[in-house]
Amino acid sequence: MTKTLKRPEVLSPAGTLEKLKVAVQYGADAVFIGGQAYGLRSRAGNFTFEQMEEGVQFAAKYGAKVYVAANMVMHEGNEAGAGEWFRKLRDIGIAAVIVSDPALIMIVATEAPGLEIHLSTQASATNYETLEFWKELGLTRVVLAREVSMEELAEIRKRTDVEIEAFVHGAMCISYSGRCTLSNHMSMRDANRGGCSQSCRWKYDLYDMPFGKERKSLKGEIPEEFSMSAVDMSMIDHIPDMIENGVDSLKIEGRMKSIHYVSTVTNCYKAAVDAYLESPEKFEAIKQDLVDEMWKVAQRELATGFYYGIPSENEQLFGARRKIPEYKFVAEVVSYDDAAQTATIRQRNAINEGDQVEFYGPGFRHFETYIEDLHDAKGNKIDRAPNPMELLTIKVPQPVQSGDMVRALKEGLINFYKEDGTSVTVRA
């Protein structure tokens, strides 16, 4: 008998209303955002109630949901006004809140009935008994701790019917399930109440301090300054394991990341899910393309976290970043004129005549070309556009759509050959 596979939700991050709309347009089945209170990303451009309402209405047009992360650790006095705040979320149409502190869970359950509760990864759920415990308290979904292995995940799925949400992409915290106090000590900002300063990613000098002896600087003896953060997670080539093991929601980290990141990563995971559910062969055919696409927005090296064993020193960033993005985000498409074969684009980074670029859009559409026939908003021919947010027009040989993105290779020179056999040297 053929096993029926459940389609997992692709859950994308959205730090702003713009990012929410981009995530939904690029295939997210749901997005998670932060509000003005109770979250862990105080610098993520969190949503007002009005923005939430607009986001919920926009997502609904695409059949997508909006969740709100409210996963801070509560201290005495923080609960004031919480009931009213959560009732407002419920009335706006927020599909669920992501919570870790039992105090907030109790407040939501008793003072905002009808608002679905998901357990945050901050609660460190690592076994099926924990999921069953939270189920008894009315929670419908649990975000597993990042420290759970694939073998453990499979066993949890067999023994509980609670919805499982699992991280598949993004930054990894050096502390257990993100519960860290390093930021408190280094910058007097409480990471568990929305103030993480990412102290683990700072550069440090190391000293050898044998007992009873004078400390000795190791500067010069080690190749780079020390940092203690992890590489990023990417499970794009292991999506079959996630689907086969019955994960209900594939979570992408990154509410503070750019629309370039959100669009690219969402696009890839949606394509991966669609391909595998069509056939394993279809997934294998595009797998390397998906992996290559991820490197275009990577800020650090990529690994699989704890899913296939305890991370080694190769999954830690003990020194300088060893890989950098090959591409930079330069523009988004506003409109396309089929007759003239020109696109109006809103610039995000400097663009030059002759730059080699790649257009990409929802549905894993992409093609490469180069910047040709560059004009400003007044119709003047220009060679360079250095100022962000300008409206520009360029010649584009293939049709593109509003909301498509444009990125460029970052450095170097490439000889680009046109169809007529002539070549131009472009910055890459």
Where are the model-predicted features located?
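Charged helix-capping and loop-helix junction motifs
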Residues: 47-52, 80-84
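Surface-exposed amphipathic alpha-helical tracts and adjacent flexible/coil segments at the periphery
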Residues: 1-26, 30-33, 37-40, 56, ...
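Alpha-helix capping/helix-boundary segments
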Residues: 103-104
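Conserved non-cysteine loop/helix-boundary elements of the Radical SAM core domain that shape
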Residues: 42-46
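Gly/Gly-Pro- and Ser/Thr-rich, intrinsically disordered tail segments characteristic of DNA damage-repair
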Residues: 80, 114-115, 119-128
